[in-house]
């Protein structure tokens, strides 16, 4: 059995087709006609742009505009004027080939992103290397395997599936995907989920461990794959596949209905999004609102701070898409771990404990005031709420509320409409906020528990460090006690308490969260129906009995043992 990262859920059974990467050999030779070489480069770039637009158009018809935009983003990345200028300057100054110059510039750019300790930004390195490889192949006349010709029942095996490769997939012919690299946030995982193809990623050496035609069964939910299984194992996976199909069909009946427990307790089931266009997916998947809109995307992949108008349009579009449903927008959560040169952030030894999020914003009030103005203005177009990240004390919340009050006075003077009852809440993700939750609940309009960071900070663990990653678990009694305390403090003051971390969609944790009194579950759009079903299958009496047993546990192992008995 091969174990990897669960990239896209589902069961797959099929035959291996290995996507082999052609070796790209770049000659180290000098040229004399630099104009001709620059013309070669421009011709290759033009073909790349045309091919990419065609692929994106095909992808939009099959999986939608959001995922097609990943490919269109490659064009935007390449059209950064400084990149082509650097390549042509190298051709002229060093008298080297277009291939050599392109390779140097794009590899240097990719390496910058690869060094950033942020999984989403590291993905930019993969993007630039994909762009580089495709243009080099155009220059060298190399043609890749046409994935669109893969026969039905194919399990694609590759070192990595780039967006350009994935664009050619005919979804009904692909039973599964196995790769040697990639994670949950990689483009290969995102596109596999969009096409509903089970995928297991980051299986070391899988390309050399299988051969074309090998039989494979895989579980994209657990991250497991078996090559050339015996008849009994394949039959077991065939049964799992049928069960999975039945479950997907069953979930359809949970669309368009309220989120209510088996004994009538109503909760809100909303979505996490990262871009304005994601709001459409939230609506399509029956989300009841937006529980977390990360605004960092507006500040990335650009050379200047986004204007008030740019931000206003982004926030307004989400509010309008949600048509009166609640939209919680988290203010800028950025720090030294993210490469945004124009912000002038210094590299820090421990950026997750450093100058970031609200700490950065309250010192750079020029940037923060612009964002808050845009948010307050956008509140006139829907049920927008403002959420402040990484709060450790009530003084930070008071500072934000004071800034918003001043902005409202300005807008009154300017005759600009806004919601005068705009709510300002807190992302509860630090031990300090947990300890001060009783005080914070008196001044915050709502709490939203960010379990990802709350777990990391509470357990003092870097989840990227494999030696201590075992400590990173929301099932640890310390984390569960923190969550329970936050909810209790919020309830005492009568404010809404939600959760926007991964724990909100965990079927084993949901009964505990219901017992604790969580009001709002914010999950990925694709998890909405599954989470609603889990809640509908839960009775509060049983949840509370389970929570009593769990809260008496002293270790995570004890917690897991109790949950395993349910």
Where are these regions (language model features)?
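Non-catalytic, soluble scaffold/interaction modules
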Residues: 1-321, 327-334, 364, 368-372, ...
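Conserved alpha/beta-domain cores
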Residues: 248-566
């Amino acid at each position: 059995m091969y174990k990897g990262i669960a990239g896209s859920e589902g069961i797959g059974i099929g035959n291996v087709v290995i996507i082999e990467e052609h070796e790209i050999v770049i000659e180290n030779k000098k040229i004399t006609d630099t104009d001709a070489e620059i013309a070669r480069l421009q011709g290759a770039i033009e073909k790349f742009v045309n091919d990419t637009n065609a692929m994106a158009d095909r992808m939009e018809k099959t999986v939608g505009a959001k995922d097609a935009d990943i490919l269109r983003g490659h064009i935007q990345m390449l059209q950064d004027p400084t990149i082509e200028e650097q390549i042509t300057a190298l051709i002229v100054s060093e008298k080297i080939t277009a291939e050599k110059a392109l390779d140097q510039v794009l590899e240097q750019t990719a390496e910058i992103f690869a060094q950033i300790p942020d999984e989403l930004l590291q993905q930019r390195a993969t993007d630039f290397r994909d762009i580089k490889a495709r243009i080099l192949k155009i220059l060298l006349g190399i043609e890749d395997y046409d994935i669109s010709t893969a026969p039905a029942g194919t399990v694609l095996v590759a070192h990595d599936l780039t967006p350009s490769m994935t664009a050619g997939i005919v979804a009904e012919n692909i039973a599964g995907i196995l790769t040697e690299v990639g994670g949950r946030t990689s483009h290969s995982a995102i596109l596999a989920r969009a096409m509903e193809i089970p995928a297991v990623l980051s299986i070391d050496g899988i390309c050399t461990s299988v051969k074309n035609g090998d039989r494979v069964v895989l579980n994209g939910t657990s991250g497991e794959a078996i090559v050339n299984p015996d008849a009994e194992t394949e039959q077991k996976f065939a049964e799992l596949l049928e069960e999975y199909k039945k479950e997907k069909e069953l979930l359809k009946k949970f669309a368009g209905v309220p989120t209510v427990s088996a004994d009538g307790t109503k909760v809100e089931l909303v979505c996490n999004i990262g871009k304005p266009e994601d709001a459409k997916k939230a609506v399509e998947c029956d989300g009841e609102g937006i529980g977390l809109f990360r605004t960092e995307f507006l500040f990335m992949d650009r050379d200047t701070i986004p204007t008030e108008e740019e931000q206003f349009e982004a926030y307004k579009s989400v509010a309008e898409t949600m048509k009166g449903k609640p939209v919680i927008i988290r203010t800028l959560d950025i720090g030294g771990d993210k490469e945004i040169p124009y912000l002038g952030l210094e590299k820090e030894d421990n950026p997750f404990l450093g100058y970031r999020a609200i700490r950065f914003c309250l010192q750079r009030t020029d940037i923060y005031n612009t964002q808050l103005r845009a948010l307050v203005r956008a509140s006139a177009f829907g049920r927008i709420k403002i959420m402040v990240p990484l709060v450790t004390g009530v003084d930070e919340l008071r500072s934000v509320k004071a800034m918003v009050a001043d902005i409202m006075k300005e807008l009154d003077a300017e005759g600009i409409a806004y919601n005068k009852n705009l709510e300002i809440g807190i992302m509860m993700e630090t031990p300090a906020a947990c300890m001060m939750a009783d005080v914070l609940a008196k001044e915050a309009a709502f709490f939203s528990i960010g379990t990802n960071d709350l777990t990391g900070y509470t357990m003092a663990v870097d989840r990227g460090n494999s030696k201590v990653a075992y400590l990173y678990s929301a099932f640890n009694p310390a984390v569960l006690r923190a969550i329970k305390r936050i909810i209790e403090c919020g309830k005492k003051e009568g404010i809404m308490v939600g959760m926007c971390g991964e724990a909100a969609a965990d079927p084993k944790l949901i009964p505990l969260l219901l017992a604790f009194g969580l009001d709002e579950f914010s999950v990925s759009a694709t998890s909405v129906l599954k989470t609603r079903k889990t809640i509908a299958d839960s009775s509060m009496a049983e949840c509370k009995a389970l929570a009593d047993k769990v809260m008496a546990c002293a270790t995570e192992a004890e917690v897991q043992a109790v949950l395993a008995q349910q």
